[in-house]
Amino acid sequence: MAYRDQPLGELALSIPRASALFRKYDMDYCCGGKQTLARAAARKELDVEVIEAELAKLAEQPIEKDWRSAPLAEIIDHIIVRYHARHREQLPELILQATKVERVHADKPSVPKGLTKYLTMLHEELSSHMMKEEQILFPMIKQGMGSQAMGPISVMESEHDEAGELLEVIKHNTNNVTPPPEACTTWKAMYNGINELIDDLMDHISLENNVLFPRALAGE
């Protein structure tokens, strides 16, 4: 099956583990989820046929949960429990680890200087963002008022873009989240945690941008 003309966001939601494949190739399927596979591959100078072949293998497996057809209230409850609660645990721990690594290894050229600052910025942005969703937007959608939520949704999408930009800064700051040979246990654990955060946040944004928001605006 030809996947090249399909949007990345749609592929990430319809094919098991496609999101992990896109992460491997550093392709943005959340904020950039509307771009086609062909366009995304061209921008990264990747062979689209190779990626299509990998997607075809993944597509042979059953998908665990197809959120594209789930009730909006169920999607919202899932987002709060699976992503919002998780981010509230992840970021404070990562900030503590980054503070320690930057202090203890300050003399090493490979230390990710400024990482604590960037993680703190992300934490502050996401905390405010998630609170607005939980207190304003999500109740509107649950009450069947999603079609009137163009304003709040456009603000949330803009904040998603800002979070995505911060993730790019963090990836650049950490050599694409790759620990150097001299990294201590805390350093390695922190990078594992950052990779997990990036995976979770991209899946979180993808589910909102590519499923929840369009369906809410359509009046479901």
Curated annotation (Swiss-Prot):
Keywords: Cytoplasm, Iron, Metal-binding, Stress response. It holds the Pfam family ScdA_N. One of its GO terms (molecular function) is metal ion binding. One of its GO terms (cellular component) is cytoplasm. Homodimer. HAMAP family: RIC_YtfE. This is Iron-sulfur cluster repair protein YtfE. It comes from Escherichia coli O157:H7.
